[in-house]
């Protein structure tokens, strides 16, 4: 069997698909990924073929600025859905579809799997007459957002003489307690257990990240790859260190330890490190609320403090709060003192950890990636 994955050129979109891609690979199937060339080292480490198509994430954003005069990161922070829709369903499709289609014709897939904001894969599936599965990151998009995407995709398909076919399967990583209350499962829904990202083959033999505990609570502070504002993070560190915490801080893709001058003997800094390792031996996770981090933390039963900045983060934050698994703030820069107080609260009030552990149990009930790969292969046999 030949399975072709598609993803927008962003780590937070690619990484949730990796466990399923590994599962197909480990079955002995032929697996490849269509996304930007910049991710070649990631796929080489995974022993998965990369078929490079389309620009980098930065390239898509630069084209958005040229076309619209709007910075899509700033638009995501201010909650402008039209700009986000244009970036994923307009600009990225325009810049990547033809190369992706050429690669797919040569690859001859039996199945296409596309993350929920990749619209190139479904269009390629229609062009080739191949079944496809879509894979969201977490809770479903609110109806107004989904309707805007559907309208833009319809226009993109019409310009290319394609149909807007619904997916054959909806691979759902969202545990019930986090899902939007009015959501109805689409046809072809299959649960898929989310996993905190780990290096291939490293599940049982990874190096410890830290020495012995000092007795202080340990906070994992992770702010993703798009919204890592070092000035804001510095202010949050100051607030956290006024409390008696140890802090494990991720630097994202662009920051360096030197950006956090004056911080501090109780802070450990980490470049790009698998979340599976970062979560070891921590007590609470402070995050902007990307779906991968939220689901990864909850899979370990860890409570959260969420300070969303943009993209899908406000959606995830609202669902964490509704489930009782953490404290969340409105989008934007939260007051550092209030954030530190929230961390202290989720550490000292057991109901937050209890809710997180309940969701962890729900996640364990979802089918593992190898089960889902077998089920899809059987359906296509």
Place the predicted regions along the sequence by residue.
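Nucleotide-activated sugar donor-binding and catalytic core shared by glycosyltransferases
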Residues: 1-8, 19-32, 142-143, 266-381
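Conserved nucleotide-sugar phosphate-binding/catalytic loop shared by glycosyltransferases and other
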Residues: 32-82
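Short, polar loop motifs at secondary-structure junctions
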Residues: 35-40, 116-119, 174-179, 251-258
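Short, conserved active-site loop motifs that form the nucleotide-linked donor/cofactor pocket
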Residues: 48, 168, 189, 266-268, ...
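Conserved nucleotide-sugar donor-interacting segment of glycosyltransferase catalytic cores
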Residues: 53, 59-61, 85-164
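A short, active-site helix/loop in glycosyltransferases that binds the activated sugar's phosphate group
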Residues: 158-188
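Donor-nucleotide binding loops and adjacent catalytic segments primarily
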Residues: 193-284, 294, 314
């Amino acid at each position: 069997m030949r399975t072709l994955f598609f993803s927008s050129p962003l780590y937070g979109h690619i990484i949730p698909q990796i466990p399923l891609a590994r599962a197909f690979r480990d079955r002995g199937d032929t697996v490849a990924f269509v996304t930007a060339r910049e991710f070649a080292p990631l796929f080489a480490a995974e022993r998965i073929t990369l078929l490079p198509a389309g620009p980098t994430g930065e390239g898509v954003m630069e084209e958005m600025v040229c076309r619209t005069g709007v910075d899509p990161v700033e638009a995501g922070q201010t909650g402008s859905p039209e700009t986000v829709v244009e970036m994923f369903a307009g600009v990225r499709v325009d810049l990547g579809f033809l190369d992706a289609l050429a690669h797919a014709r040569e690859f001859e897939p039996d199945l296409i799997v596309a993350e929920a904001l990749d619209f190139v894969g479904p269009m390629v599936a229609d062009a080739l007459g191949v079944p496809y599965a879509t894979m969201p990151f977490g809770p479903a998009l609110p109806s107004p957002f989904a309707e805007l995407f559907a309208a833009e995709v319809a226009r993109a398909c019409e310009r290319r003489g394609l149909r807007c076919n619904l997916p054959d399967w909806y691979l759902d990583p969202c545990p019930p307690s986090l899902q939007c209350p009015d959501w109805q499962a689409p046809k072809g829904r299959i649960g898929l257990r989310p996993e905190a990202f780990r290096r291939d083959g490293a599940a049982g033999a990874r190096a410890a990240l830290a020495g012995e505990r000092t007795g202080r609570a340990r906070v994992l502070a992770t702010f993703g790859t798009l919204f890592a504002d070092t000035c804001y993070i510095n202010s949050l560190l100051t607030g956290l260190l006024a409390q008696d915490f140890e802090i494990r801080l991720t630097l994202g893709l662009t920051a360096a330890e030197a950006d956090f001058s004056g911080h501090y003997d109780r802070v450990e800094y980490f470049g790009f490190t698998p979340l599976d390792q970062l979560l070891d031996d921590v007590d609470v996770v402070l995050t902007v609320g990307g779906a991968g981090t939220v689901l990864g933390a909850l899979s370990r039963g860890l409570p959260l403090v969420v300070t969303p900045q943009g993209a899908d983060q406000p959606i995830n934050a609202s669902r964490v709060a509704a489930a009782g698994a953490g404290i969340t703030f409105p989008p934007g820069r939260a007051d550092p003192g209030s954030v530190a107080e929230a961390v202290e609260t989720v550490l000292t009030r057991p109901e937050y950890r209890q809710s997180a552990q309940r969701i962890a149990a729900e996640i364990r009930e979802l089918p593992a990636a190898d089960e889902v790969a077998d089920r899809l292969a059987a359906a296509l046999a």
